[in-house]
């Protein structure tokens, strides 16, 4: 790692490296508060606006913590959220607001190719002075910081490094006669068949917006291509028009045809279908550590009735999908100092724990084995394994949108797996040339 994010960087990041980066966090620092940067600022104001994509359950926790900050800082913060839309809609909504001059003071965003355009357009402030003032370099996972650093500019502050696993309902697995976590892709297919025979839809996923059902395809690609080739595909260094990609698309269609995913999955909203494993309507979903708070605890269920395992790929290293999320400050904010203070408040260990961040980048906010046993279990096992960058963060928005359209066309039977592979190569190669 070099401290500079490029479109070819942050691929195949080791979760163990993230853990090492967090272990290196030790203390704080002080420096003069910086002024706003990047164009004409709005008039100074104690009215702040925060833009997010939290779910309804997590949004209430966030609002509670921001209200505490407002009471201390004398600010009034409006919190807006666009839940469930993911990278397919949220960045465009944010970009439209910023171009219209009415963007938020603080916004949440993914790293990689989703966050990068806001830095290139100088809409996001260079936060280096605030890193110095608040000592973020020594309090926040240093490897995760690289995921929010763009061409040397620390334009974001990471608060979480997420990882995708299979979160499942133990009682439904038991009903289907599944006694052990699948240890190979073949065993996962066998588990799907057992669940289906027991009258249970195996995997909860939704294709609205494209990004949720993408989690299934990227897993299938990791399985068919292996780590080295998968990384090269994501960076445009190898052709997608190849047998391994065709195999992944073939298996992707198979999951639909075998009814291992819900009927009409393409039209389902992720925020509606993902928690269905907690409700007993599906057996498992592909999601991250936030599921413990947002799905299980929010439904007042016992975490002991659920489990999580790493989707088996048959490769060494055994990897899963992962990504970084953080906060940016509007370069035209009327009060960048208060905006930075608000972010710093959110990044306090006690605030992170109150927000139930199961994969926090903040030293001292690691998962509690008592209150978040599943997140802790993940952090001590699969969480120490390497991960590859989630595909809608590895690609710029235009390519991701093309990718989602190809997924959709394949599942609708409009194109074959071979045609899907060729179309992916066309989309990725056009980007890689630039």
What is each model feature region?
Residues 2-116, 136, 180, 300, ...:
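Conserved N-terminal structural module of periplasmic/extracytoplasmic solute-binding proteins
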Residues 53, 64-65, 250-335:
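Extracytoplasmic/periplasmic substrate-binding proteins
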Residues 116-117, 121, 288-303, 314-405, ...:
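C-terminal lobe and pocket-closing loops
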Residues 150-159, 164, 189-238, 282:
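Extracytoplasmic/periplasmic solute-binding protein
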Residues 192-194, 234-265:
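Glycine-centered hinge/linker elements that transmit conformational signals in sensory
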